[in-house]
């Protein structure tokens, strides 16, 4: 997951879990939470994310966020607006 600081690419983080289904979501939400707490880092601007790139057969995926990703909570669409 790319990390932006002041609108410029500053680095990246990766997550390796027990599967591939939510690794990108955890990195995405972790960076969003860090940005909210620190005010200095952010996810890529929406206009520059990979899911804006069309390739034959579809679009590239930036992050996959299931509608209801967490157990024992009613939280849904947790990536919307980030």
Language-model features and meaning:
Residues 1-82:
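Mobile, glycine-rich extracellular loop/lid and propeptide segments
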């Amino acid at each position: 997951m790319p990390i932006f600081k002041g609108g410029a690419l500053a680095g990246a983080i990766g997550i390796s879990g027990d599967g591939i289904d939510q690794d990108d979501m955890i990195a995405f939400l972790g960076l969003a939470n860090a940005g909210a707490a620190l005010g200095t880092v952010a996810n890529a601007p929406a206009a520059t994310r990979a899911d804006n790139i069309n390739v034959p057969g579809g679009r590239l995926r930036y992050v996959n966020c299931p509608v209801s990703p967490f157990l024992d909570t009613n939280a849904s669409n947790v990536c919307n607006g980030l």
